[in-house]
């Protein structure tokens, strides 16, 4: 529960609300060692997709407030939900604020980022999939359809998916082998 403490091992960890990525997210902070378990609230190079924003609920301000909380805690070590443990929290917070500012100024950029993330995580599960199977999955997945309808309706769904695949290829996250998309 936020604003409480939990004993993990022999250390008391503070529980802090960290809405943004998810309205019910928390971070854990162990003040003696200055260790923060940040979940998806802060990564070394960003933060998690802000799902409420994609669904039409304003949550970018909550991400900013969560970054303020983390900054006030002044962690010496951050254990993120994704990526390596890191020690330069001020740099990570500054980078996260710049990314957030870009998303606030251009919400479509956030929606595109989210679509690529969702596709990449599914590709991590599959490891490879025929492009026809990918198209069938995208068409049958309600959240993916909502993302397209809400943020990219002006682009035909098949062209949008093709563009997402091309973005994953450009970034080195995937490659095509014939008619199959392969995770990298």
How would you label these PLM feature ranges?
Residues 1-9:
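Active-site HxH/HxHxD metal-binding segment of metal-dependent hydrolases
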Residues 1-2, 22, 168:
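Residues that act as N-cap/strand-start positions at coil-to-secondary-structure junctions
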Residues 3-4, 26, 172:
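Residue-level detector of beta-strand structural context in well-folded domains
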Residues 12-105:
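Metallo-beta-lactamase
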Residues 111-184:
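C-terminal regulatory/interaction regions
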């Amino acid at each position: 529960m936020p604003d409480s403490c939990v004993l993990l091992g022999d250390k008391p960890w503070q529980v802090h609300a960290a809405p943004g990525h998810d309205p019910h997210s928390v971070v854990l902070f162990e003040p003696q060692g200055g260790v923060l378990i940040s979940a998806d609230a802060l990564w070394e190079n960003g933060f998690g997709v802000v799902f409420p924003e994609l669904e039409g609920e304003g949550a970018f301000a909550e991400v900013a407030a969560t970054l303020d909380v983390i900054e006030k805690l002044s962690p010496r070590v951050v254990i993120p939900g994704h990526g390596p443990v890191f020690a330069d929290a001020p740099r990570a917070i500054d980078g996260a604020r710049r990314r957030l500012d870009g998303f606030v100024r251009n919400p479509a950029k956030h929606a595109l980022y989210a679509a690529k993330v969702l596709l990449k995580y599914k590709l991590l599960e599959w490891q490879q999939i025929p492009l026809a199977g990918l198209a069938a999955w995208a068409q049958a997945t309600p959240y993916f359809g909502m993302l397209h309808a809400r943020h990219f309706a002006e682009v035909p769904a098949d062209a949008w998916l093709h563009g997402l695949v091309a973005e994953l290829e450009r970034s080195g996250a995937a490659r095509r082998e014939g008619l199959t998309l392969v995770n990298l």
